[in-house]
Amino acid sequence: MLDVVPWSAVLSQHFGLEVSSGSTRGLLLRLAALLHDVAKPQTKAIDDSGRMRFLGHAKAGAAITANILERLRFSGKEIKLVETMVRHHLRPGQMSDNELPSHRAIYRYFRDTGGAGIDVLFLSLADHLATRGRHLNLAEWQKHGKMVEYVLAQHFERESLVIPLKLVDGHDLINIFGMSPGPRIGEILEAVREAQAAGELTSREEAISYIRERLATEEVVY
């Protein structure tokens, strides 16, 4: 069963890294596994079909986890890592339906999970096993493992998915397109990074054309 879980020397090194105070990523992953569903009692609800739901338990659990670890005098780095794992533990299963996740989805995943992206993937595997228990569907488990393996491969082999090279910056948007400083510039630059991760943009010229078309479309819609 565990042969489905991807593993390598690089991953072993990752989970052996010390975060602070002697605690490693592997240790904090275990702590996140212990706490990831801590908010289920507070968020429990029964829907119209009679099915039990725990809407918002990941977000609520992250806040509870942070509070618990603060009271236990964990360091800021430790708290941030564990809180992030708890907050996003459902995210890997939401990246795609029946197919492997797109490059755009993988980029967004690592953007949102920050330095905890790898850790969250393994928490999702542990959660899958714990949730199904003896009712585990082997085909679904293998599918989950394949997805995690694919996302990890893209992460390690395609650095541009995690940190795309800068093709344009805020000064370009101001000088070329006459935009005013503000949040809109950040939104446009993030859209460019996503398009890069998806393989749609590979050069500065393509990025400028992409922005020009996007702004023109927005003007028409407006």
Question: Positions of the model-derived regions?
Answer:
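Charged substrate- and nucleic-acid-binding regions of tRNA-handling and nucleotidyl-transfer enzymes
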Residues: 67-71, 131-222
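A basic, often C-terminal nucleic-acid-binding module that engages the phosphate backbone, implemented
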Residues: 121-130, 172
